[in-house]
Amino acid sequence: MSADDRTLLTRAATGDGGALEALMSRYAARVYRLAYGITRNAPDAEEVVQDVFLQIVNKGAGFEGRAALASWIYRITTNVSLNKRRGKRRELETSLDELLPTFLPDGHRAGERSFVVADWSATPDRELLSGESRRLLEAAIDRLPEHYRAVLVLRDVEELSNEEVAQIVGDTVAAVKTRLHRARMALREQLTRHLGAGA
């Protein structure tokens, strides 16, 4: 952690509004982006930002500096976001097993296969940029179980390393890699089913 970050954190913890404002200008956008990625709801993400910075003020004096300040803030954000989502439970999450492809004992894919060979290459830019595809992706992320969603957002949206994600979610790197792989597989399956059906 930089000396400047430590100074700002110490001052914010003692009630210095200017220091808190400086920390917010550095980290609020990242906190919001992560919170929105997990809660999938703008008002909830805004509440998470407020709660995170309140915790930073309340717990800042106890921060030991063993991790980078950004990692500590990401961990607080992840925990607050997951708690917010658990408290709401407005949307039902889907079991990951329901989202992944199924295979027969001989190794072939079970079920409808016409969408597997759908050709998306004709218009990849248009398909990726369309609002419908964005909404489809967001809906697919919404259906992921929360611990898969958190890892996916931290790794693929926030572009943190597997080691950083593991530290933030309090798990091993191997577990993070497994969750990330399963989350990506589930997203791929959902997108393939939808986009392949229209081909």
Each model region followed by its residue ranges:
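Helix-turn-helix DNA-binding module
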Residues: 3, 135-175
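C-terminal edge and immediately downstream basic/flexible tail or linker adjoining helix-turn-helix-like DNA-binding
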Residues: 11, 93-103, 108-111, 136-139, ...
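Sigma70-family region 2
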Residues: 13-14, 40-41, 51-68, 86-89
